[in-house]
Amino acid sequence: MAAADGMTAHVLQLNDVRLRRGEREVLAGVTFGVHRGEIVALMGPSGSGKTTVLRLIAGLEPFQSGIVQVEDLTIVGNGGNSANTLRLLRCKIGMVFQFHHLFEHMPAAKNVWLAPVHAHGVPFREAVRRAQELLALLGVEHRANALPGELSGGEAQRVAIARALAVDPPLLLMDEPTASLDGARRSELRELLQELVGEGRTLVIATHDEEFASSCATRVLRMNNGMVSSQD
């Protein structure tokens, strides 16, 4: 896929990011950048570090050394980040986990508006309105009152995407987004991601799905042994 029109400076930049767990080097100097409006796919075998990179970008995984830059915000290794820096980071990033992690006892709409109200201080009425708009954008407004267990896999994923977009982040991270989807749902997701890019989002996706990555990604970064080994 050709690069998106109008791409500007990097929204995301990783420089020589390293992570060890005991004697194992999980990330061995990961360096790459992502421009605004790109869909970048991280591919590689299990254990290559794809999901770890996403969690690290989102501030969910500490790392020993290197730098992660998200727009004008710099995250450093070895725990040298203030609570305020991490709070600002989470306003810039939305993450969709492989297994969604929706709260099973809460309706879909509450799953979307809960974090903006309680973690980001968004007024309740504004957060509810935003949740309704996002569910409509993603085509699941009719499931607003459904519990997660009542949703299909595709519906649950769309609610999870709505939740990730609830604080209007410029960067969206997705871990194995096609894992539970059939061919038709994959096509729907591909179209949705293009729509999100058209609205000014930037996406980084970790996936094993070669066909999906090649059909929707601006670039594919291939990881092996904790580093980016090639890109195409």
Place the predicted regions along the sequence by residue:
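Helix N-cap at the start of a conserved alpha-helix in ABC-type nucleotide-binding domains
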Residues: 183-185
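Conserved ABC ATPase signature
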Residues: 147-151, 155
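Catalytic Walker B motif of ABC-type/P-loop ATPase nucleotide-binding domains
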Residues: 172-175
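Helix-to-loop junction immediately C-terminal to a conserved catalytic motif
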Residues: 58
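The feature captures the beta-strand-to-loop junction immediately N-terminal to the Walker
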Residues: 43-45
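ABC ATPase NBD coupling module
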Residues: 75-94, 124-125
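Conserved signature/switch motifs of ABC ATPase nucleotide-binding domains
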Residues: 146, 167, 199
